[in-house]
């Protein structure tokens, strides 16, 4: 699977539409790596002009901030912001709710102002623009539920984009007792 690296595109004078911020989990956690690969397939199928930072990407700093180490957080964040600004990045998409929240809501106070989207929002946009299509396939007639992550849901009020995508699968979306703003934390940090 070929994944464009921002520094290489810049050397060729190519400005990608969006930067895919992979994040620590998306790079190292086996389960999250599957999400990363699947999202890259979607980007490629939709002919999205995108790039990743590759070896230049560092942790967003969220774990340091959440564990109370503001110094380490700011060092990581400022380093990332300087890198992103040096590339004149305007739009970032990420699959990680923690990275999403940090890049969108915390980086601006340190000089990093970007349009930041969660991949569910980005995929939903691709669907609305007819850049990708989903066929119901083997999901027809099945029931599914969706868990709202803390940082995507309650922290950023993104509830409908994931559900809109699920509805495209031609399945029966069944809401949990505690959903959306009443959702419960899964305990896994996302």
Region locations from a protein language model:
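Iron-sulfur cluster-binding electron-transfer modules in prokaryotic oxidoreductases
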Residues: 1-190
